[in-house]
Structures are given as structure tokens and as C-alpha cells.
């Protein structure tokens, strides 16, 4: 752990010029420092952490605990320059939290400062909590990850002609390869009645766009399906289920779903990239992004995932089930793989890492774990443009322990390249666009590598721009009005196309998009099934 001189760098009290804007280091962290100093002073007789253990041997050279002051300065500078509003950080090493601190405003208008116990919207870091909840059901034989999700769905089923819906297994639903397309929609307080239940969402958007298992497409609908599955097999609403099966037994007392209205005032407000407050909103897929949690709680969730059996935490999963959460399901070209709820990969030296990012209007979050090094980093922010700061903080922290650290990209998809027309794509195609209340005729004409048009219904042909290849898929952007209640209501008319060959057809989706991703936006998926035009 290093000598006492090194460990004194944990005294991160704010300098005199920053004391008014930055809280002192928490009592929790001070206790950790004293405990670590005592452990070092008696020659390591005490265990590294009374909070847990990790059974995996280290395979990389991990440096002694670093001086976190440079990272603090990076965060304080971002806040003082108006590039951040509120930030919370936690670092785990050797089975304990070695640093946790809050900076700036959780709610500037209410005068609420950030602490390590401030609940932030996690956005997509919610997904591992959802997957963990499903895994507890699998461990009790209430469901099987390798069975079709439809086996556990009651009111609404996964449907579609672009492959076999039974290929959309529980595991694939949580690993972004179920064939369901991506989706996002936010609802402010005045639109709360428009937010669909998981069953209603599946009824409107639960159609596969691609053959299950054939390609990666990051998807929130799959996690809505997982929520519906969990509720159906238990008879309990999903927010309550996550609380009962994960949050409470793991001692994550700062954590709650957005549906817990009474607790929302304790959470961090959300701000756009200019620092303006964003009105409260919910989303169409709560199980994919509506959990609130503090940096302290996320750090303890990381301890659970790294098999540090924390004192006071219930054993909700045996180690083999935890390992199942982290097992690669779909490996992308870069070597990054999806798991059931996570992404994973390896450094050049072979050191494995597990990670998840979160991002939506007013939210940027990051969690990286290196289990073999018993090392993890959590950064939570409440700004739309917080991704760069999250990455910068986490990268600097992890590199101070493992110099070879390089941040991976959270995708298992191929990199885009210029589109080159092939016989599989070239020519005229006709078919249908379906989802929500829409069922429209569609015509596509791919004339060359840089010329294509799309026709929706009886509307004029629209040019497709930005034509690219993503592995075997064709992508491009067009415009048009889709005759569905959601597209009309939101004014979503920018159309993002993705198509791939399948059994002589082209199958895929159009995403109808609108809005500003920094404030409020929408991505609505409509499934395409196209055959060669006969005339």
C-alpha cells in the first residue's frame, strides 16, 4: 500500500480558496485513511480491508496509491470554467474505497452541494443493476438465460419477420444482440402519462430488425423486455424488484428508481451543456437508465462485482453467477465484447477490464473495473457534456495505477467505412416499414456507392446522405414523415437507416430522430423489410 508519506496524500482537504465551493473529504474516507495507515504501520498484520476480499491474482504492475490532488484540480478547474456543475468520484483499490469525494452543485438552485452520498442519475449504468436482478432469478431457476425471452413474456411478445423471434434469448436481450433496434425517448412531467409500461412498449416497438445474434446494436428495448420478464415471473413491479433483490441486500441505501418520487429531491438535478437546468424527465425504458445512485453506492456495487465480499452485504449471488454476468456474449472487431449487462475487454498485457458508461440529457457517468488488480473507478456528473471530464478523470486515475491503461470504446460494432455498392445492395427495393401504429410502403433505390433515395408511402423520393458501411450493413441518413402517432407527436423526421442482407432481402430499421441530445431528444425505431423490386 506504500509508506506513510505516500498515504498522507489522501488528506484531500480543500485549500482556503476552495473551501466555500468544495466540501471537505468525507468522514467515511478519513476512516479508510486511518485504517490503511494503521495497517501499514504494523507491517501488514491487519488485512488490506475489513470490507472485503478478491480472490483473483494480480497480473499487472500496480503502483502505490497515487496523489489524487492533480485529479481534484482537474475537476475544480472544470467547475470554475463552467464546464461542469456537479461531480462525484470514488476509487477502489485493494478491497476498499481509497478515495471518494463530491465537488460542485448537486442542485445549484436549491443550494445542494455534491457529496459522495449524493444520488445521481446513472443513465445506462442502470443496465448492470437490471442484469444483476435478472441473474438472481436465474440463480433461483425462475428463468434461464438461454431460453427465448418470449417464454417469460405474458402480455406482449417479441415479434417480427426479420429472423426468428425465439432467437431473442434472455441473455441476448441483455447483451445488445437480440435483433431489437435501439430506441430512446424522454418525457417531462407534463408528458408523464405518455410514458409506456414495458408491456406497452413491447407491443409498439418489440419487433426484431435483424436476425437475433447476427449483429450488435446498442438497445434499450431489450432491457424493457427484461423488466417485463422479471415482473411477469415474480408478480412484482420492476423498481420494487431491483430494490428488494439488489439495492437493499447490498446496502446501497442512497439508490432508488426515478419512480420513487419522494426521494427525487435528494438526487442531483440535471444540467445542459451551458449549465442551464433541465426539467425533470423520465424515459420510455426505465430499466435501461432511470436508477439513481451515489458514487459511494456504485463503488460498493463494483466491490460486489469484483467478488470483494463486503461485510454487511448479503450474498445475493454465488461467485459463479457473478462470473456469468461478466462472461463475453458477443465479441466485436476491436476485441471489446458485450456481456449480460456489461462490456468487457483486455489491455495489451492481457489484464481484463469490465465497464459501463451512461449518458443522456444532463447525465454523464462512467464505471471501470479491473478485477485482477482489485481496482475500480467511478465518476458521476450531472451535465450533458460531462463525458470528456468523466473520461479524463477516470483515465488519469487508472493510469496512475496501471500506466498501460487506455480507455476502450463502448461498442461491439464495426467501425464505419465508405460504402461501396455490391450486388447484395445495388438496385431497387420495395417493402414495408412497421412499428407503433405505422405500416407504410417503402421504396429504396441504391444507384451507386454515393447515390441512393428513399420513398415513404406516397411522398416524393428523398436523397440518402452519409452513406457508409458498418461491417455487412449499409447506413445512411434521409428525411421524411412516418405515419405513426409517436413520430407525429415528436416531429421526428430525420431518418437514420441501417440495413443488412438476409435471405435475399434487406432487413433493418429506420430511426426517426428529433430534438437536442443535450436537452431533450427522441429516437424512434421502425422496422424495414425489403424485397427486390419486380417492376
For every predicted segment, state its role.
Residues 366-369, 373-383:
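Short, well-ordered beta-strand elements
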Residues 15-41:
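N-terminal secretory signal peptides and thylakoid transit peptides that target proteins
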Residues 381-443, 509-535:
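Short, gly/Ser/Thr-rich active-site loops of penicillin-recognizing serine hydrolases
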Residues 145-161, 250:
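Short, glycine/proline-biased beta-turn/loop segments that scaffold the active-site neighborhood
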Residues 65-122, 142-144, 158-159, 195, ...:
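Short, conserved catalytic-motif segment at the N-terminal edge
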Amino acid at each position: 500500500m506504500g509508506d506513510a508519506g505516500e498515504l498522507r496524500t489522501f488528506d484531500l482537504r480543500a485549500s482556503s480558496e476552495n473551501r466555500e465551493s468544495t466540501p471537505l473529504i468525507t468522514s467515511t474516507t478519513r476512516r479508510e485513511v486511518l485504517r490503511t495507515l494503521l495497517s501499514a504501520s504494523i507491517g501488514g498484520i491487519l488485512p488490506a480491508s475489513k470490507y472485503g476480499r478478491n480472490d483473483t491474482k494480480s497480473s499487472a504492475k500496480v503502483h502505490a496509491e497515487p496523489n489524487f490532488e492533480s485529479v481534484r484540480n482537474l475537476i475544480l478547474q472544470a467547475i470554475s470554467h463552467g464546464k461542469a456543475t456537479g461531480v462525484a468520484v470514488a476509487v477502489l483499490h485493494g478491497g476498499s474505497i481509497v478515495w471518494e469525494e463530491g465537488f460542485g452543485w448537486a442542485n445549484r438552485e436549491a443550494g445542494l452541494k455534491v457529496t459522495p452520498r449524493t444520488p445521481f442519475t446513472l443513465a445506462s449504468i442502470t443496465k448492470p443493476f437490471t442484469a444483476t436482478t435478472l441473474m438472481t432469478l436465474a440463480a433461483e431457476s425462475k428463468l434461464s438465460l438461454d431460453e427465448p425471452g418470449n417464454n417469460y413474456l405474458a402480455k406482449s411478445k417479441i415479434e417480427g419477420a426479420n429472423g426468428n423471434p425465439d432467437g431473442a434469448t434472455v441473455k441476448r436481450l441483455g447483451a445488445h444482440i437480440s435483433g431489437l433496434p435501439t430506441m430512446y425517448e424522454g418525457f417531462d412531467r407534463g408528458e408523464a402519462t405518455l410514458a409506456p409500461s414495458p408491456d406497452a412498449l413491447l407491443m409498439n416497438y418489440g419487433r426484431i430488425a435483424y436476425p437475433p445474434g447476427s449483429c450488435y446494436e446498442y438497445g434499450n428495448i431489450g432491457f424493457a423486455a427484461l423488466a417485463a420478464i422479471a415482473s411477469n415471473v415474480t408478480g412484482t413491479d420492476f423498481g420494487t424488484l431491483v430494490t428488494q433483490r439488489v439495492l437493499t441486500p447490498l446496502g446501497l441505501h442512497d439508490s432508488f428508481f426515478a419512480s420513487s418520487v419522494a426521494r427525487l429531491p435528494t438526487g442531483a438535478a440535471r444540467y445542459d451543456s451551458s449549465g442551464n437546468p433541465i426539467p425533470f424527465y423520465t424515459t420510455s425504458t426505465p430499466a435501461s437508465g432511470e436508477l439513481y445512485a451515489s458514487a459511494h453506492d456504485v463503488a460498493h456495487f463494483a466491490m460486489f462485482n469484483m467478488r470483494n465480499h463486503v461485510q454487511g452485504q448479503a450474498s445475493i449471488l454465488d461467485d459463479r453467477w457473478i462470473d456469468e454476468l461478466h462472461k463475453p456474449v458477443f465479441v466485436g472487431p476491436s476485441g471489446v465484447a458485450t456481456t449480460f449487462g456489461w462490456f468487457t475487454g483486455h489491455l495489451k498485457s492481457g489484464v481484463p477490464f469490465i465497464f459501463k458508461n451512461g449518458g443522456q440529457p444532463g447525465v454523464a457517468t462512467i464505471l471501470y473495473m479491473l478485477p485482477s488488480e482489485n481496482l475500480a473507478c467511478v465518476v458521476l456528473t450531472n451535465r450533458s457534456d460531462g463525458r470528456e471530464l468523466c473520461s479524463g478523470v477516470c483515465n488519469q486515475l487508472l493510469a496512475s495505477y496501471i500506466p498501460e491503461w487506455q480507455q476502450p470504446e463502448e461498442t461491439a460494432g464495426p467501425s464505419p467505412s465508405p460504402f461501396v455498392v455490391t450486388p447484395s445492395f445495388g438496385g431497387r427495393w420495395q417493402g414495408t416499414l412497421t412499428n407503433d401504429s405505422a405500416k407504410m410502403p417503402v421504396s429504396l433505390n441504391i444507384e451507386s456507392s454515393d447515390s441512393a433515395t428513399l420513398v415513404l408511402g406516397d411522398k416524393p423520393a428523398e436523397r440518402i446522405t452519409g452513406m457508409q458501411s458498418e461491417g455487412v450493413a449499409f447506413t445512411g441518413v434521409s428525411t421524411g414523415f412516418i405515419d405513426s402517432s409517436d413520430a407525429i407527436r415528436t416531429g421526428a423526421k430525420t431518418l437514420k437507416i441501417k440495413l443488412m442482407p438476409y435471405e435475399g432481402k434487406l432487413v433493418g430499421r429506420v430511426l426517426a430522430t428529433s430534438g437536442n441530445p443535450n436537452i431533450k431528444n427522441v429516437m424512434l425505431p421502425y422496422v424495414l423489410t425489403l424485397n427486390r423490386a419486380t417492376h
